[in-house]
């Protein structure tokens, strides 16, 4: 079985178990939502940008103290989690009026994944110069927070169908508070590899700096993203 097909089937299996846990809430449900986020993080989107995130948080080329690195990690993760919870809140509120909103999320996420794949393969440009200029002129904490928000918005496109299941559950049960707690726990699980990688950044940076990884990581990640995004796009279209 191809890796993208295996990943797709595994996500749907976890999605079904998550839905069962949401409909039979207990203490284990909260831990399972966390592990659902952790499992979903092993997707082409997050894996492809994981080295970039860790090097950015750790201040590659800068002599940052451990306290500064922890502060960077905190505000970066706060931004990423904020983007997830804000997306969840907006989608939930809009879904009360626009119930067809959720139907388009898998298609949009697939297109974002495909674009990220093309950008890693240098087929299409991913211009961030203007954004970087604006961010560099701000406070370091705000800079890390805004970077986390941007990364959170980008990688959230790879969190379907489990993230969509959470949103639909919140909407159908009209329990926004518990729903936001689930989304918060899920988002922490989703960015957990970034947290672990940043805490052990010294070892990671030594490995990531090898010429072999530098030359092969981008094309490998781009190919995986393009394959997974295309498969997800056609799967979503065929459902209509």
From Swiss-Prot:
Question: Could you give one GO CC term from the UniProt record?
Answer: chloroplast membrane
Q: Where in the cell is it found?
A: Plastid, Chloroplast membrane
What are the protein's UniProt keywords? Chloroplast, Cytochrome c-type biogenesis, Membrane, Plastid, Transmembrane, Transmembrane helix
Where on the tree of life does the source sit, at the highest rank? Eukaryota
Q: Which InterPro entries match?
A: Cyt_c_assmbl_TM_dom, Cytochrome_c-biogenesis_DsbD
Name used for this protein in its record: Putative cytochrome c-type biogenesis protein DbsD-like
- Native source organism of the sequence: Porphyra purpurea
Q: Does the keyword Transmembrane apply?
A: yes
According to its UniProt entry, what is the function of this protein?
Answer: Could be involved in cytochrome c synthesis.
Q: Name one Pfam family in it.
A: DsbD_TM
- Single GO biological process annotation from the record: cytochrome complex assembly
Membrane topology note:
Multi-pass membrane protein
| Family in the record | Belongs to the DsbD family.
């Amino acid at each position: 079985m191809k890796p993208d097909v295996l990943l797709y089937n595994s996500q749907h299996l976890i999605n079904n178990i998550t839905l069962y846990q949401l409909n039979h809430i207990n203490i284990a449900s909260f831990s399972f939502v966390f592990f659902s986020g952790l499992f979903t993080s092993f997707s082409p989107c997050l894996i492809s940008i994981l080295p970039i995130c860790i090097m950015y948080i750790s201040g590659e080329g800068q002599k940052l103290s451990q306290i500064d690195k922890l502060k960077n990690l905190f505000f970066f993760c706060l931004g990423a989690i904020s983007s997830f919870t804000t997306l969840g809140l907006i989608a939930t509120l809009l879904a009360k009026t626009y119930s067809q909103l959720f139907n388009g999320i898998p298609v949009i996420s697939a297109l974002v994944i495909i674009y990220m794949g093309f950008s890693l393969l240098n087929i299409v440009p991913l211009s961030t110069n203007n954004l970087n200029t604006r961010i560099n002129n701000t406070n370091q904490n705000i800079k890390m927070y805004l970077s986390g928000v941007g990364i959170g918005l980008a990688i959230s496109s790879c969190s379907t169908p489990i993230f969509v299941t959470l949103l639909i559950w919140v909407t159908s049960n009209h329990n926004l508070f518990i729903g936001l707690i689930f989304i918060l726990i899920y988002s922490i699980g989703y960015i957990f590899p970034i947290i672990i990688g940043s805490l052990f950044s010294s070892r990671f940076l030594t490995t990531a700096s090898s010429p072999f990884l530098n030359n092969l990581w981008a094309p490998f990640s781009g190919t995986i993203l393009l394959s997974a995004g295309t498969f997800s796009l056609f799967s979503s279209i065929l459902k209509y």
